[in-house]
């Protein structure tokens, strides 16, 4: 019996390029081979290098998790579904750009989900609740009070009128 529930968790693009990797076994070089195989394979669960490999295809992104052969497969499948729901809750639209934009939150989500290959949280809402909230993402996400926005608009308008003289 192996202590690990999970040997590795990968976030890859549809070509198999790894965007994020968290490996808990000594065989780290296998991660790239697993990502490449999962990108070319259409199955959601398979066996590769004596490991159970589970893959979720989300638009341009693949979530890949691999475990030892003697792991409780239904348990890993269920917590992987929950992790996938939490992942989608963070990135909203699973594209390569969104993964890079939300990379810090993905790292924190994986840390909440797994500790040294052992599943720590099996519910997506619990994982999301424990993540720190971002105040905003750039100027687009900033909440500006209505009165201040009106004042700023009037000030900009009056300054632009004054500069044309």
Swiss-Prot record:
Q: Report how it sits in the membrane.
A: Peripheral membrane protein
Q: Which cysteines are joined by disulfide bonds?
A: none
Where found?
A: Cytoplasm; Golgi apparatus membrane; Cytoplasmic vesicle, COPI-coated vesicle membrane
The question of whether Protein transport is a record keyword is answered with: yes
Which InterPro entries does the record match to this protein? Answer: Longin-like_dom_sf
A Gene Ontology term for the protein's cellular component = Golgi membrane
Gene Ontology biological process terms in this record: protein transport; vesicle-mediated transport
- The answer to whether UniProt assigns keyword Membrane to this entry is yes
Assembly and interaction partners: Oligomeric complex that consists of at least the alpha, beta, beta', gamma, delta, epsilon and zeta subunits.
* UniProt record similarity statement: Belongs to the adaptor complexes small subunit family.
- What is the protein's given name? Coatomer subunit zeta
């Amino acid at each position: 019996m192996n202590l690990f529930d999970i040997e590795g968790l990968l976030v890859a693009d549809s070509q198999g390029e790894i965007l994020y990797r968290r490996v808990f076994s000594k065989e780290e070089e296998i991660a790239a081979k697993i990502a490449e195989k999962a990108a070319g394979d259409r199955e959601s669960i398979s066996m590769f290098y004596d490991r159970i490999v589970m893959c979720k295809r989300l638009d341009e992104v693949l979530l890949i998790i691999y475990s030892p052969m003697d792991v409780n497969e239904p348990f890993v499948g269920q917590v992987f579904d929950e992790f996938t729901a939490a992942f989608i809750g963070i990135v909203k639209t699973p594209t390569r750009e969104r993964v890079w934009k939300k990379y810090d939150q993905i790292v924190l989500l994986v840390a909440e989900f797994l500790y040294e290959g052992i599943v720590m949280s099996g519910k997506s809402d619990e994982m999301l609740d424990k993540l720190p909230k971002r105040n905003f993402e750039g100027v687009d996400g900033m909440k500006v009070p209505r009165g201040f926005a009106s004042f700023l608009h009037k000030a900009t308008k009056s300054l632009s009128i004054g500069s044309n003289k």
